[in-house]
From Swiss-Prot:
Ubiquitous. Highly expressed in mucous cells. It is found in: Golgi apparatus membrane. This is Polypeptide N-acetylgalactosaminyltransferase 4. Gene3D superfamilies: 2.80.10.50, Spore Coat Polysaccharide Biosynthesis Protein SpsA, Chain A. The record marks 459, 478, 483 as: Interaction with glycopeptide substrate. Disulfide bonds join 124-357, 348-421, 457-477, 503-518, 547-565. The gene is GALNT4. The lineage of its organism: Eukaryota, Metazoa, Chordata, Craniata, Vertebrata. Keywords: Disulfide bond, Glycoprotein, Glycosyltransferase, Golgi apparatus, Lectin, Manganese, Membrane, Metal-binding, Signal-anchor, Transferase, Transmembrane, Transmembrane helix. Belongs to the glycosyltransferase 2 family. GalNAc-T subfamily. The keyword Glycosyltransferase applies.
Amino acid sequence: MAVRWTWAGKSCLLLAFLTVAYIFVELLVSTFHASAGAGRARELGSRRLSDLQKNTEDLSRPLYKKPPADSRALGEWGKASKLQLNEDELKQQEELIERYAINIYLSDRISLHRHIEDKRMYECKSQKFNYRTLPTTSVIIAFYNEAWSTLLRTIHSVLETSPAVLLKEIILVDDLSDRVYLKTQLETYISNLDRVRLIRTNKREGLVRARLIGATFATGDVLTFLDCHCECNSGWLEPLLERIGRDETAVVCPVIDTIDWNTFEFYMQIGEPMIGGFDWRLTFQWHSVPKQERDRRISRIDPIRSPTMAGGLFAVSKKYFQYLGTYDTGMEVWGGENLELSFRVWQCGGKLEIHPCSHVGHVFPKRAPYARPNFLQNTARAAEVWMDEYKEHFYNRNPPARKEAYGDISERKLLRERLRCKSFDWYLKNVFPNLHVPEDRPGWHGAIRSRGISSECLDYNSPDNNPTGANLSLFGCHGQGGNQFFEYTSNKEIRFNSVTELCAEVPEQKNYVGMQNCPKDGFPVPANIIWHFKEDGTIFHPHSGLCLSAYRTPEGRPDVQMRTCDALDKNQIWSFEK
């Protein structure tokens, strides 16, 4: 039977069809918009991530960009350089070396913007920093009659490796230089550099006070002190500031890489850096990292605790530096201030560290460019304020220091009391436990004088960088300690420990007296370094069966050797004297 549609039925069917069609179209449109919206969201998110990365890269940018590297240029990438010079040029070079103790003739021909190869550890290079949260810094560079090219290379090195967002300023402090080029010429040059300020002292202040003058003008959160002949490597600044940002009581040093004074080769330490120590003359020394410090650190890029610092290059929170009492302004010129500050940091609740990811090259001159006549005065101040009863070991090895007028130290002692600083005994046991503490028993330390050749004393003078590379000899007694200071220990060792812990030995089948490294505390004493200092004044060596004897060479020069013992031979009689 056929179905007949009424008008009303047809209308309902059409309405239903349109409704379904509308819903279908809406679903399509919604799906399209959702898909397009997600695409736009992904695009926007990607753009924001890209912007964030771009912003991070922007924040790491230095104030100035180095010119492109020229691999053919002298000294580029830190390579050694040597010039082929005629007679006149060679004479000029030697004159400049004599004046500056650095090969300035070569330095003047090396780019002020040279590139240094970045050999830092992978973990250092891959570190990420939140630049917006890092403290800012003022870099303080004090100088006196510094050569033009080494000073400017230092300045450009800072400007070209320090993120602009972190570098508040470079403050140059001219400590009354008298070189013409450091007057108007320098002012004109730095007037074209952003964030570089020049301050001149009106009298010779010395390194300590010159740096303090710079610190008073600093506006950064952190004070970063550099010497005036340095080159900063890539990424040198961020690790220092990040560490201080996490712990304001940390005083942090970069790894100090060596720049050869003659060839300007940049020797970058790629292994574990050395840490600072001292000998009992209060002279700074480098030491390897002890096992307990290696065990304490979790990562090889963690900061390394150091008993002392070299002093030329370090960063410290400005607030904390002021809290600690800044530098001891009673110290003159330079020398000893680094140990004084090191003791103070540790004994007064701070910590001193070397950051393995921060590298700064330093030109170590052929010799000190100018004298430090106040070294004993400065070290005596440090000993009197911070070393308690242990200062006697310093004075025993530096007899002239007992007569030094080290000035008024009452304020420094009040500072120690106010900060509730710990004892030097605590420092030795907790910070530098590997340092051997001398016995210095009464009557058994000092110069050992020959009774047979009474003007002569035992003397040990080793070559540089080879402590055991010489033999015991005789030299005119001078009463200055140093090379003529020895200690006879309860272990029957004859120790030479003004510089490093060396023990007198007689090599097998030999008649001379050499030196070897002493055994560490608690370890057995080898037979060939045991001596008997007898009541009659003879010094007997049981292992060889011989006695120490003074004698004169055929040329008449006094010397010492091992000989058959003879109680009647005055040349075998010795005595300790201060």
